Amino acid sequence: MAKASEHFFYVLKCSDNSYYGGYTTDVIRREAEHNAGIRCKYTKTRRPVKVIHFEKFETRSEATKAEAAFKKLSRKNKDAYLIQREESE
């Protein structure tokens, strides 16, 4: 279980192969909410979804900035971002 002081930017892969980036304090809970259709407009019709990437940040501000930057990327650049992050782990 995540501590309240943990902040995450996460990426879901949807059933239509699109990506959804979001912010949460608990990645496991948020994935379950997306799959249950709770508090999610975009992913509700694209279930099931799966967390394919997440990053931990010290502050909410840092995590939401990472989310906003990811959402601005083209699909090609999102793919490259995810590959680069996977290779660096």
UniProtKB/Swiss-Prot annotation:
Gene3D superfamilies given in the database record: GIY-YIG endonuclease
Alphabetical list of InterPro entries matching this protein: GIY-YIG_endonuc, GIY-YIG_endonuc_sf, UPF0213_domain
GIY-YIG domain span: 5-80
Cystine bridges: none
Transmembrane segments: none
Family: Belongs to the UPF0213 family.
Identification of the protein by name: UPF0213 protein LMOf2365_0181
Source organism: Listeria monocytogenes serotype 4b (strain F2365)
Upper taxonomic lineage: Bacteria, Bacillati, Bacillota, Bacilli, Bacillales
